[in-house]
Amino acid sequence: MRIFGRNTPNNNQDAVRLLAKACRRFGRGRNRLLAGASALGIIVLCTVFSIAYGKMEADYLQAARGNGTVAASSLERGTMEQYHAIQELDYVDCVGRKVEAGLLYSGKEGISGLEVVDSVAWEKMQTPAYTHIHGNYPQKEGELMLSVRALEALHISEPKEGMTLKLSAVLATGQREEIDFTLCGWFREYEDPGISLPVGYTSEAQVQKWGMSLEEPDLLLICQKSTIDGYSVEDRLYE
């Protein structure tokens, strides 16, 4: 570089290198801070969404247990034609059938409702609302599955599969029948004891003996897909 006709040493390249080096050091620190802030933000967002999702799941489970089923809607006295038609609806996840057979008594004390449901209703709608499920759903005539609350009403604290329960069944048809049931399982339910009796389940073979059938259900139980709520499903069904 020439100044006033003389050659002056040029240190611009060294200065540029020093500035570039300093910028890189500063940039690395800034990038680390930005990366750390971004990672922290992602972690916080994930935590918030996880907590919110967990609360939604907990509220859903609590509501299902309180209702005794995860079915969000139902259709009374639905026909098999309606049953098959509902299965084809794009906003319905699954459909189950239930027959309300009657009530069970020990002496004069009502201890449990008596129902039969199909495999879809049991596995996808009832089981998720219960805990401590032991044994299997009734398959044979005379088999019975009771809630722990009903067993406690019978003063049974240590139930065993295969034990005999002498009970009276007051049927929906108006009949009363003394039956030696065989206990095939039990479960814990969470419905409000001040509102309703616990539910018990018997086999389809048993209710057929009484002249009832899942081919003529009292209720069609419906689980809708997540894109629609239960009230909207019922409104559409009754249109």
Regions found by a protein language model. Name each.
Residues 1-46:
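N-terminal Sec/SRP start-transfer signal
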Residues 29-34, 40-68:
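Alpha-helical transmembrane segments
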Residues 53-239:
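Basic-flanked hydrophobic alpha-helices used for secretion and membrane insertion
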